[in-house]
Curated annotation (Swiss-Prot):
It is found in: Nucleus, Nucleolus. One of its GO terms (cellular component) is nucleolus. Component of the ribosomal small subunit (SSU) processome composed of at least 40 protein subunits and snoRNA U3. DEAD-box RNA helicase-like protein required for pre-18S rRNA processing, specifically at sites A0, A1, and A2. Residues 1-174 are annotated as: Disordered. Residues 31-46, 112-125 have a biased composition (Basic and acidic residues). This is U3 small nucleolar RNA-associated protein 25. Keywords: Nucleus, Ribonucleoprotein, Ribosome biogenesis, rRNA processing. The keyword Ribonucleoprotein applies. Transmembrane segments: none annotated. It comes from the Eukaryota. InterPro entries: P-loop_NTPase, UTP25, UTP25_C, UTP25_NTPase-like.
Length: 731
């Protein structure tokens, strides 16, 4: 069964460059994942057709480039080269036979395979898309390709090898040199929720809570701030370019970088327009560093096993499948921004299918949105399609877009796009083995994903790091022990960036972030959205607290309080003499769609509200009905208007005619508080009257996270625990 989109039948159409809603949809062929790893070129081509240029073409080009390089000393013409190519190659092989195996011997082997590679180039491109993940056979092919480019023999690469030999490198301590007994001890502690916490404050009024497994050992010391890239264990290839784009770390960044590059989980609840690009560059640098170190470790171990064939080597350096990084994003345009960060940090000579990527993922901003808020334009600007997926594969010289998932290093996807791949339409076959070896998972703009369908996020994380159903040609002798023991989810690093934290995001932090290295939560200290109201006159803002015994009963308790304490006064103010309707201009803001349906049905059927005329706008309301409801409300034909938070998130309407605001619940996004209250001032002539009507909001103790953002951190405690009254007013 196809997963629900999460926006329902809303009229908020995506504006993708080609109008598509992701691969395999609207007449396209369904995506399929191959169960083999390294296929012969005569195998059936992928039905996905995602790979574009073939691997064979690149290899053949590299062969030609290498032969040209070796033959550069000859001044003979082309015909003479053709006549003497075999004797020359034979002579070259004899010359190289006595040389050091670390250098020319590799190139000799490359020349020996050149004719074979050229044959592969002749094959159909789609046949070559049936490549597999990072198995022994494919890495041998890659190794030959990399040898030609100098990955293992150049002096520059030799400098990089020092990073991998550094015992203090977090990559080594977290993934390679793992004490199995200590790992198991930490896992047992985590399974019983035996976390020990340390609290700290960061510059800029940020609160940090570090949790780590309490194994009874020495106290965990908070890492010192990182003041520059030189303090990080970066591959030289990245360090050479990162300094051009990532300046000296600011106070907040310097405090968080050690946790990110130290492979600890991070929940950052203070993402803003000003810091989003900085953190995006940081996590892109981190995942690139991880990919390069993983790849080079496998290549070097392959070289070692070839040099010592008689030795019984224990080389545990791989997972079950190739993909190591998963980045979850809300829109295609957000994916473009991440890819741009990756490409500026990883200088590739070639980018295969780059034009196709920008044609299908990027779009121009809507010029009619110039009056929209900045956060809206950042989220929905460009291509706002929320169903996509993209595989990226990295070689020494090339970034390959649209690589098959099982042949990719990084997977970028929206929750819906990933869910559509994991669950086939026929419901008969599920495929999520490509998520079995994810070692770094990133969720960016988590607050935006909440407004899509958070259940997709929960579904994806519940399928991360599971034992694969099929072997996919895996060489189990090279798989790390903690993969074989089913412990990968305790080693995986998860990074979540959000503008604010909700109960759903907290649940993800508690239930899916089990990193044995520890996890960190960062939240800001809030001054309160009530202080930033865009009106020229003061507005009375009243908060009414109702009692609720549990989160499960909260919807019923809220509805009971609304109908008994709030609705009665609304009906009186909206009814004139003789029971005739009187326009009151009351906007009823409802965060939850389920609550919206409940209130709407009650207003339509209850005898208590038989004289109350109202309109309703939700995320599922058609454009025509939205226009009609807004017109009737502005003209006074409707006394009240129901309005949901998700509607405001997707459309940011400016509702005119508002003289009073009732909030059935406070919004999750604190920005919405000022925007909704600001409706009172859209008609300058009635601003004073609207200010008298003011705002009334309902809340319970289960709304603590939302209320902190609205009223401020310092005021929250008294409002939740105050026993002297249940009503709080601010002007």
């Amino acid at each position: 069964m196809v997963a629900p989109r999460g926006r329902g039948s809303r009229p908020f159409n995506s504006r993708g460059a080609r109008g598509g809603r992701g691969r395999g949809q609207r007449g396209g062929r369904k995506p399929r994942f191959e169960t083999s790893r390294v296929e012969e070129v005569h195998h059936e081509a992928s039905s996905d057709g995602e790979s574009g240029l073939s691997e064979g073409n690149v290899d053949a080009e590299d062969e030609v480039e290498l032969i040209d390089e070796l033959s550069s000393g000859s001044d003979d013409d082309d015909e003479e080269d053709k006549k003497t190519s075999k004797p020359y190659n034979t002579l070259l092989q004899l010359f190289n036979a006595g040389q050091d195996t670390n250098g020319p011997a590799r190139k000799r082997r490359k020349v020996e395979h050149s004719s074979k590679k050229t044959e592969v180039q002749i094959k159909e491109p789609e046949e070559l898309d049936d490549e597999a993940d990072l198995s022994e056979s494919e890495i041998e092919d890659d190794e030959e390709d990399e040898d030609a480019e100098g990955i293992a023999v150049d002096e520059g690469e030799a400098e990089d090898s020092g990073d991998e030999d550094d015992a203090t490198d977090p990559f080594e301590t977290h993934f390679s040199n793992v004490d199995s007994s200590l790992l198991l001890q930490k896992i047992n502690v985590i399974s019983t929720k035996g976390w020990k916490t340390h609290k700290n404050e960061l510059p800029g009024k940020f609160r940090l809570v570090l949790s780590h497994p309490d194994t009874g050992g020495d106290a965990v010391q908070l890492p010192p701030p990182a003041h520059g890239l030189q303090s990080l264990k970066l591959k030289q290839k990245l360090a050479n370019h990162a300094g051009d784009h990532i300046a000296k770390f600011e106070s907040l960044t310097s405090g968080l970088v050690p946790y990110i590059f130290g492979y600890q989980d991070l929940l950052f609840g203070a993402r803003t327009l000003s810091n989003s690009a900085k953190f995006r560059d940081l996590y892109c640098l981190h995942v690139l560093n991880h990919i390069l170190k993983t790849r080079d470790r496998v290549l070097k171990n392959n070289s070692r096993s070839q040099k010592e064939p008689d030795q019984d080597l224990e080389l545990r350096d791989q997972g079950f499948t190739r993909p190591k990084v998963l980045i979850i994003l809300p829109t295609r345009q957000a994916c473009v921004r991440v890819v741009e960060s990756i490409t500026k940090l990883y200088h590739a000579e070639q980018q295969e299918n780059k034009s196709r990527f920008y044609d299908t993922f990027s779009a121009a901003d809507d010029k009619s949105w110039e009056d929209k808020p900045d956060d809206f334009r950042e989220l929905f600007g460009g291509n706002d399609d929320d169903m996509f997926r993209l595989g990226l594969k990295f070689t020494r010289k090339t970034i390959k877009y649209f690589s098959q998932f099982y042949n990719s290093d990084i997977i970028l996807a929206s929750p819906l796009g990933l869910r559509m791949v994991m669950d086939k339409e026929d419901g008969k076959k599920q495929d999520f083995d490509f998520l079995s070896s994810i070692e770094v998972a990133v969720v960016d703009q988590a607050d935006a994903l909440l407004m899509q369908n958070w259940e997709h996020i929960e579904y994806v994380f519940s399928h991360l790091n599971l034992q694969p159903k099929e072997s996919h040609g895996c060489d189990f002798s090279r798989v790390r022990n903690w993969y074989l023991d089913g412990q990968a989810k305790y080693v995986r690093q998860t990074l979540v960036f959000s503008s604010f934290i909700t109960p759903e995001i907290n649940a993800l932090f508690s239930s899916q972030m089990h990193n044995t290295a520890g996890k960190v939560k960062v939240t800001p200290t809030y001054e309160g959205a009530i202080l930033d109201i865009p009106l020229p006159v003061p507005v009375k803002q009243t908060f009414s607290r109702f009692n609720s015994t549990s989160p499960v009963k909260d919807p019923d308790d809220r509805f009971k309080y609304f109908t008994s304490a709030v609705l009665s006064s609304l009906v009186r103010s909206s009814t004139g003499s003789g029971g005739k309707p009187h326009a009151s201009g009351t906007l009823i803001f409802i965060p939850s769609y389920l609550d919206f349906v409940r209130v709407r049905n009650y207003l339509a059927t209850s005898s208590q509200t038989e004289n109350l005329s109202f309109g309703a706008i939700s995320e599922y309301t058609s454009v025509r009905d939205v226009a009609r409801a807004r017109t009737h409300f502005f003209s006074g034909r409707h006394s009240a208007l129901l309005y949901t938070e998700r509607t405001h998130h997707f459309r940011r309407y400016q509702i005119r005619g508002v003289k009073r605001v009732i909030m059935y619940g406070v919004p999750e996004n604190p920005v919405f508080w000022g925007e909704i209250v600001g409706f009172l001032g859209l008609d300058p002539a009635g601003t004073a009257e609207a200010a008298e009507g003011g705002v009334r909001a309902l809340f319970s103790k289960w709304d603590a996270l939302k209320m902190e953002r609205i009223v401020g951190t310092k005021r929250l405690g008294n409002m939740l625990m105050e026993k002297g009254g249940d009503t709080f007013s601010f002007v």
